[in-house]
Amino acid sequence: MASSADANQETIGAGLAPPPATDPPAGEAGESQVQTDLGQVEYLAVGHISVDIFEKRYILGGSASYAALTARQLGQQVGILTSADFEPLLVDTLVGRDQMLEPETPIRILRVPTQSTTMYVNEYDEHGRTQYLLGRAADLRPVHVPEEWKSAPIVHLAPLAQEIEPGLLHTFPGSLMLITPQGWMRGWDQDGKVYPVTWEYADEALARADVVIFSTDDLPVPSLIAEYGRKARVMVVTENRRGCLVYERDKAPWRSHAFRPAREIDPTGAGDVFAASYATQYHRTGNPRAAADFANAAASFVLEKRAWQGIPTVQAVNDRLKRGKRRGA
């Protein structure tokens, strides 16, 4: 699952404020919340948006950001419950004023006030990537959820830095719940250096979730895949160009092959687009196989452009499902 932190520097200009020169703060939630426009939503993404630093540029990141943009592009009314010290560029992107995505329906944002926005930076050397957490926004708790959002048809818990409290697992009793647990598999030291950790609330989350999606790169202990697969109702493990493996309870896992993009430019956000597309189609059809094919087709478009500029419409995805070529099929 490609991280949105890996976006190309051309995606967004350097219009954001620089990160704080302090150790990662825990973030304190305020008594009030700032939002654009509330009301009923069909797809609720819960998790930190982030400012990711790439080649001295500050860019929009976070699974919640990409998932929300995807759900909006697929025709849903979308809300985000997050915590951040909003910079204007982030708001412009999420509510649609950047004119880069259609439709123009604004994403409804509820923000828990905090002193800092979650920020990641990646450093690369001959040994690979080292990731640092430079700032962290406030934790997200059940008390932050407005009453009208508790009945959202789809709820996507998308932790980025251990910010989602486990009580949120039980705040949406009638919703289809998607969990992308990447941010529950990260820890960091006093210098902000990120390292893998075991998913602390895995049993509780797997018991509640309708769908769990992560990549083979996210899991610190690969042997846990089979264990999680036995406990989950539906679990999808993405494998980049190989597509994904789908685990249904009491069934053998099966593969949905990836679609070939017209060109390959940037994988940023492909995993997040896959997840939101899967949940959207699974909610519409109830068919885990059809949802996997739909999500693979949607994710293939993301590779063709920079970051969220490649997020497709439903019509484009359906056309690729009919006419697209698949890897390994």
Language-model regions, residue ranges each:
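Conserved N-terminal subdomain of the carbohydrate kinase-like
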Residues: 35-42, 51-57, 73-163, 168-178, ...
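Short hydrophobic/aromatic-enriched beta-strand-loop microsegments
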Residues: 108-109, 177-181, 235-237, 255-257
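Histidine-anchored nucleotide/phosphate-binding helix
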Residues: 62-73
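Active-site metal-binding loops of divalent metal-dependent hydrolases
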Residues: 47-49, 273
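Charged helix-capping and loop-helix junction motifs
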Residues: 60-64, 193-200, 259-260
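Short beta-strand scaffold segments in enzyme catalytic cores
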Residues: 69, 120-122, 244-247
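Conserved phosphate-binding/catalytic region of the ribokinase-like
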Residues: 2-8, 12-13, 17, 30-39, ...
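Conserved beta-alpha-beta core of the PfkB/ribokinase-like small-molecule kinase fold
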Residues: 154-227, 232, 242-243
